[in-house]
Amino acid sequence: MIRKVTKNKAYIVIDAIRNPYEAKFFKDRYAAFHLVSINAPAEHRSKYMQKLHKFSSDQIDTIEKIESGKTEGEFSAFTNQNVKKCIEISDIHLFNPKSEFNNNNILKAQIAWYIALMQHPGLIPPSSMERVMQVAYTMKMNSGCISRQVGAVVTDSHNSIKSVGWNDVAKGQVPCSMRSLNGLIEEFNPVSYSNYERNNQAFRIKANEKLIKIKEVNLKSQIFEGHNLSYCFKDIHNSLDDKGNQVHTRALHAEENAFLQLTKYGSSGIEGGKLYTTASPCELCAKKAYQLSIAEIIFIDPYPGIAQEHIINIGNNAPKLIQFRGAIGKAYHRLYEQIIPIKDELEHMIDL
């Protein structure tokens, strides 16, 4: 419609998408759609909102809660604002520090970079940060976790890749995505299900309650037909004692897995190196990164715990936390892959 009215090219910006399913609709509907996240350090963002919009600390906390994706209500999982998830699935990540209130030069430079690539894919090559993070993004697809897929890469100080990792169970064990409640209750397979899962009555009762509930729903709507009824061991175990203990996860974290590959297959040392992660390190992985003398941690999605305040920002050899900026996933290929080799393009332009 805009093209017809203006009789010209149309470049459209939608401000602002805060629901991940809205974003996925546009991603699936329009091939040229790019979901862009603009990130700023939490302390900069708070000061900016207080100064520009005159928000109080309580008002900012309320906004954070609304945008967290955790508010309750009918169909809330599908209709809630969830900025954290939107950042996770973004195609392009921009960094907008607000240490100087009126200085937007860093943001402007990044916008110019990606607009140029949208109009002319392959005009310039990706940055080293983008190149390595794209590998981490690819690695996360190997994860068999049914909650969240995370990828990680460890490099030396020159961004030469030394190891990769993703969140998954130890080698030789069956990932959660390939296990099921049916198998747990009926099969007693010692390869797929642990001795605890096969013999602890409290755990099995809780798991069976979940399976019965699913079967009751399926009798009415057949909604689960064709689905593997995977389950999260941690969720069921924690529900027994009403504790949110992260120790009970079956999977290694992606960062932890990448560190272990260095030991498993040998390494010349990683002191002063870098950790790239599609999430950000938890408290346990942050300690491991610190002990390995990782110099920089490049992350996409800030971890909600106290890893930064309690583990990383202390001592005299603290790793530097860097928010990722760049294109990733499909956008990486769409923006950096030349449609026509530049040499051929120039030759064709001469002939026009």
Predicted regions located by residue number:
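Zinc-dependent deaminase catalytic domain
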Residues: 1, 75-79, 84, 97-352
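ATP-dependent small-molecule kinase phosphotransfer cores
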Residues: 1-11, 17
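Short beta-strand/loop segments at the ligand-binding rim of alpha/beta enzyme cores
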Residues: 7-12, 30-35, 265-274
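Conserved phosphate-donor/acceptor-positioning beta-strand/loop module used by diverse small-molecule
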Residues: 15-17, 26-53
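Short beta->alpha connector loops
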Residues: 16-20, 280-283
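A short acidic, amphipathic alpha-helical/loop segment
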Residues: 24-29, 284-288
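Short, well-ordered beta-strand core segments
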Residues: 35, 92-94, 297
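Small-molecule kinase domains that catalyze NTP-dependent phosphoryl transfer to phosphate-bearing small molecules
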Residues: 51-109
